[in-house]
Each structure stands twice: as structure tokens, then as C-alpha cells.
Amino acid sequence: MSVIGRFLYYLRSVLVVLALAGCGFYGVIASILCTLIGKQHLAQWITARCFYHVMKLMLGLDVKVVGEENLAKKPYIMIANHQSTLDIFMLGRIFPPGCTVTAKKSLKYVPFLGWFMALSGTYFLDRSKRQEAIDTLNKGLENVKKNKRALWVFPEGTRSYTSELTMLPFKKGAFHLAQQGKIPIVPVVVSNTSTLVSPKYGVFNRGCMIVRILKPISTENLTKDKIGEFAEKVRDQMVDTLKEIGYSPAINDTTLPPQAIEYAALQHDKKVNKKIKNEPVPSVSISNDVNTHNEGSSVKKMH
């Protein structure tokens, strides 16, 4: 990586921390005010939108969304692949009003961000205490059904930071909730963001995340004994979609992970081969009385 690239990587990393802290503080104020007027359920949406616009302005990032019409009818449980810090930026763009999130309990104690999440109704999960986590999720399900809201879950359970077009194995919590409440699952697939952010390779580029929101999947006829199979099918569908979307388009001013460079080369080769395949083949006729010299000349000219 060049000196300028390394400088940009650290500068943008610092800017993200500042943006998170600033928007977290804003979120604390917004959560208090929204709670006072009986609108606590809007605090996360308001703060998420703020973070989206701040990051877009500061870092030259954006989000392109396909299938947003699939979020029109609540209640539902949204699930998405979990990759990096930029997931918060993506949330800021598509987060529906009245939606809330689940998060690991350790985030609750992060200054500003954790305080905002606690005040705005986030459901914190301690995975080392299974029954407590189940009770918390059931509480979230009750709220979602009663008030026709949405719940956002990252079924991978942690950020993958992967530079491959794949996802970690899914935990089953979101699917148990959906089956129990008979509410649909809405899969959200985000393009691989290692071309935008990757601590492993020192990547922090400007660019655009591509988000595809799939159609809601009914759980009306889903039984408990089929939840594992159902979760695997949903994951397979999401991974297939991820492979279709590929990597996030980036303006490479730091560096790129090798997997993304290889993928770009393969895509280029496919386009070239497709173009060659679709080009009409010139028709060349050679009469019987053409001598060997002229025949060779004709073939050479055709090539």
C-alpha cells in the first residue's frame, strides 16, 4: 500500500469513530425526546438516518437499494449478512421506521453508541445465558406483533469481515421467533464490502454498497422440527444472491483485497468471451480454382 493509501485508511477509520460517537450522542438526545413524547420506537430510525447522511458526506460512501417495496407490509423479521462497521451505514439507509435491532450485550457499555441503543429500545443478548437471551427475544417478538413493527437480526451473530462471497453459518434465533410468531422473514443481502473496508488488507475506499431486499418468506406452515432446514434454505438463497451481486463498487484510493481483484478479472474475461461469442462470424467462400497461395492469403486476411 502507498503512503497516501495508508494515510487515507487511518484518517477514514478515525472519521468513522468520530461519526459513531457524534451520532451516538445525537441518538441519546433523540431517544430521550422521543420517549418523552411517546415515540421511542422512532429513535433508532431518526438516528440511523443521521448516521447515513454524515457518513455519506464525510467518506464518499453510498448505498443502492433494490427491492425496497418488500418492506411495505409489517410485521416481519429482517435478516442480513453481517460484515463490517459499514453495516451501520447500510442500516441508516434502509432501516424502516418503527424497526429495532438485536445486539450483543457488550455493546451496551460502549460510550454514546451503547447508551443510545439502550435508551432507544435495543434488545441486548447475552449468548452465554441462553434462557435470558430467549426471554429477551420473546419480548421483542411480542412488541413486533402487537404494534406491527419490524425486528432486525444478523443471524451470523458477529461480523465476518470476509473477503469471500459467502456467509458464516446462521444461528437459529430469528427463525425460531418467526416460526413462533407466524410472521415472515425478509432477507436482506448486502454486496461484499471488503472492497470498501477491510482491516486485514488495510482497505478503506470510497464507493457504493449494493443492497438487495428479497421478498418476504412466509412461516405460516413452518413447524419447529423444520426450522433448521428452513434456515439453511434461506441462507443458501442469500448466498446465491450475494454471488450474483458480487463486490461493492469502489474507488480504489487505498488498496483492494486480492479476492476482489481476482473476481474483477474473472468478470472481465466473462464479458470479453460473451462479446466474442455473440459477434457474427464472417462468411468466407473459397472457390475450387483458387491456388494454394491465394487460399492462404484469404485465410490470413480473415484472421
Swiss-Prot record:
An annotated Gene Ontology molecular function: 1-acylglycerophosphoethanolamine O-acyltransferase activity
Record's keyword terms, sorted: Acyltransferase, Lipid biosynthesis, Lipid droplet, Lipid metabolism, Phospholipid biosynthesis, Phospholipid metabolism, Transferase
Cross-referenced SMART domains: PlsC
GO cellular component terms, A-Z: endoplasmic reticulum; lipid droplet; membrane
Statement: the UniProt record of this protein carries the keyword Transferase: yes
EC number: 2.3.1.23, 2.3.1.51, 2.3.1.n7
Pathway: Phospholipid metabolism; CDP-diacylglycerol biosynthesis; CDP-diacylglycerol from sn-glycerol 3-phosphate: step 2/3
Location of the protein in the cell: Lipid droplet
SUPFAM superfamilies, per the entry: Glycerol-3-phosphate (1)-acyltransferase
CDD domains assigned to the protein according to its UniProt record, in alphabetical order: LPLAT_AGPAT-like (cd07989)
Segments for region (Disordered): 278-303
InterPro entries tied to this protein: AGP_acyltrans (IPR004552), Plipid/glycerol_acylTrfase (IPR002123)
Motif HXXXXD motif boundaries: 82-87
Protein family according to the UniProt entry: Belongs to the 1-acyl-sn-glycerol-3-phosphate acyltransferase family.
Free-text comment about domains: The HXXXXD motif is essential for acyltransferase activity and may constitute the binding site for the phosphate moiety of the glycerol-3-phosphate.
Entry protein name: 1-acyl-sn-glycerol-3-phosphate acyltransferase
